[in-house]
């Protein structure tokens, strides 16, 4: 079981990163709500991980805190929710927003997430509402999306079009349909936006 990685952040290609620990590079998938908080490429990073073994792959999912990882593990306990959908859920909204939506039984908000239909949203509420009682959203998770610091984008962008393409690819990787991803990014795009900011603004606009 790989539970924690500490090393040099080599690449950031949302929603995936590459971190080098003792000469070994680990590919880690991370919810965008956590990805925004990563340091710049070349810096040291500490990531708490959830390790998944499948017949065809071994996957690592990463988080900035143990509590974010704990929430992810609670999410994937729900019927019909695997790690990929869990990643999309915690990318489409912050951890605090997700907890609030479940507590309020806000099905209409949950179904806006990629891969979450009405039945899945209802299962999330029924199965998780009691388990999430006492989870203080204010001090358990990384800052809400609005408060996330903007990266200078130096490792993300070489031109406006490359930022748009990368943002669209990231949304598709999270489960959004290509047409929806492309349309949403185009609607929020402004000159000189980095791909990270484009992804964040696109996700905000869809919830």
From Swiss-Prot:
Residues 1-64 are annotated as: Domain I. InterPro entries: DNA_helicase_Holl-junc_RuvA_I, Hlx-hairpin-Hlx_DNA-bd_motif, NA-bd_OB-fold, RuvA, RuvA_2-like, RuvA_C, RuvA_C_sf. Residues 144-158 are annotated as: Flexible linker. One of its GO terms (molecular function) is four-way junction DNA binding. GO terms for biological process: DNA recombination; DNA repair. GO terms for cellular component: cytoplasm; Holliday junction helicase complex; Holliday junction resolvase complex. The keyword DNA repair applies. It holds the Pfam family HHH_5. It is found in: Cytoplasm. The keyword DNA-binding applies. Residues 159-207 are annotated as: Domain III. Keywords: Cytoplasm, DNA damage, DNA recombination, DNA repair, DNA-binding. Has three domains with a flexible linker between the domains II and III and assumes an 'L' shape. Domain III is highly mobile and contacts RuvB. The RuvA-RuvB-RuvC complex processes Holliday junction (HJ) DNA during genetic recombination and DNA repair, while the RuvA-RuvB complex plays an important role in the rescue of blocked DNA replication forks via replication fork reversal (RFR). RuvA specifically binds to HJ cruciform DNA, conferring on it an open structure. The RuvB hexamer acts as an ATP-dependent pump, pulling dsDNA into and through the RuvAB complex. HJ branch migration allows RuvC to scan DNA until it finds its consensus sequence, where it cleaves and resolves the cruciform DNA. Belongs to the RuvA family. This is Holliday junction branch migration complex subunit RuvA. The gene is ruvA.
